[in-house]
Curated annotation (Swiss-Prot):
Name of the protein this chain belongs to: Large ribosomal subunit protein uL1
GO biological process: regulation of translation; translation
Upper lineage: Bacteria, Bacillati, Actinomycetota, Actinomycetes, Micrococcales
Entries under HAMAP family matching the protein: Ribosomal_uL1_B
Source species: Kocuria rhizophila (strain ATCC 9341 / DSM 348 / NBRC 103217 / DC2201)
GO CC annotations on file: large ribosomal subunit
NCBIfam families: rplA_bact
Listed GO MF terms: rRNA binding; structural constituent of ribosome; tRNA binding
PANTHER family the record matches: 54S RIBOSOMAL PROTEIN L1, MITOCHONDRIAL, LARGE RIBOSOMAL SUBUNIT PROTEIN UL1M
Cross-referenced Pfam families: Ribosomal_L1
Family recorded in the similarity comment: Belongs to the universal ribosomal protein uL1 family.
Subunit structure: Part of the 50S ribosomal subunit.
Main function: Binds directly to 23S rRNA. The L1 stalk is quite mobile in the ribosome, and is involved in E site tRNA release.
Keyword set, alphabetical order: Repressor, Ribonucleoprotein, Ribosomal protein, RNA-binding, rRNA-binding, Translation regulation, tRNA-binding
Amino acid sequence: MAKRSKAYRAAAEKIEAGKFYAPAEAVALAKELAEGSKSDPTVEVAMRLGVDPRKADQMVRGTVNLPNGTGKTARVVVFATGDKAAAAEAAGADFVGNDDLIARIQGGWTDFDAAVATPDMMGKVGRLGKILGPRNLMPNPKTGTVTMDVAKAVNDIKGGKIDFRVDKHSNLHFIIGKASFDAQKLAENYGAALEEVLRLKPSASKGRYITKATVATTFGPGIPVDPNATEVTTQA
């Protein structure tokens, strides 16, 4: 294992051993531990779910519009033609195209954060499954990224919409903002995401649903969160 930096070790020492923090308390501590960082690190949440993602009826996947955004301007590509392509461009899509865009991605280019497509384009976009799928970039009707209303999809993503999907190890990851955010705004974002994760609990999932949760900034130590928390209490 790589040796941790002095700053990492100093931050980790501020986390109380054996304690499970309330979500709002955890994000406030994550923000505190990031003080002095040369960059503005992303604040992330990681969860372990009591589901078996190998079973279709236990897959957890969803989207949520973070009330305070992500602090990041997402780069969005849109696969569309004609009026829909024009609408995507007007909405602020970073890259809009058809066969040319598909060829570019087939060539190895993936410098974007989200992809949207009109339904008629999915026959072609499907060829990109092996490239976009593993990166969680494949347009999908369930996440609102296969749609005729491409302008709304672009606006939602640019406005702070995130999507999440449990991986093969039953882990779930999502961002809730930047360390520069006010602690209350981070907590509000966490609360919105947690509410959606809980809403999506599969009926086939038995026992404890969220078995582990941590909050951390990029490259920072994980702060254990009470896995039994079902809401994030914020202070005005």
